[in-house]
Amino acid sequence: LRKIRKHITTIILAVMAVIAGVYAYNYHDMKQNIVYNEHLDDVAVTVNGKELTLRDMAFYVAFEEMNVEKQALVYDSGNPNKYWNIHTNGEFVRVTARKAAMSMAIHDEIFYEMAKKESITLTDDEKEALKNSEKDFWYDLSDIDGAKKLGVEKKDIYSSMEKSAIARKYQEIYAGLDNADITDYDFSGGRYEKLLEKNNYKIKEKVWKRVDMGNVTLDH
């Protein structure tokens, strides 16, 4: 009986060791930043059944990085990375930026799908304005070699920007129907938060948390 107990104890300890090893491996894997352009087909989030990959997220990552970098250069033009590492409101600026990029993508996906159901499209004037915005954004992105670092092509960025423009247009329509200001339905707006609760989304943390915001299109 003693031998049986000893054998069972050995088995239990072995199983626990395996579990601990798997946990340690997964934890280490979660802490490792990914090389963005090597993971473009990885799913970052699912919104109402629609999967958005890192390729789909590229525009939002670049947009947020460039916006925050402007603030970083004002804070310390000689060492902008210092700003990205500031800890404020309980988290680092780079973490806040990563969350903002994801929130914008989810927001646009929701409003874009709503727009499609209502057959909302851009007018010729809106398409022309979008075309100019796309060219400006691509120029700025290329200026920092961002597209190469992201691993995306012009069509990927333009597609996301068109989707965002349509989403924004429907956001304005939706806000008007609700007698609200368009900003109430921005991704941080109070009324949008209530709308968000009616939608299903799941962020793939094992992928998204490994995106090193501040160092994807930028070199710090």
Question: Can you name each region flagged by the protein language model?
Answer:
Residues L1-V93, G190-H220:
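Short, low-structural-confidence N-terminal segments
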Residues A20-Y23, M104, S119-I120:
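Alpha-helical transmembrane segments
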Residues V35, A100-A101, S133:
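A generic secondary-structure micro-motif detector
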Residues M66-A97, K116-G190:
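Charged, solvent-exposed helices and adjacent loops that form client-binding or oligomerization surfaces
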Residues S103-K116:
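Active-site SXXK
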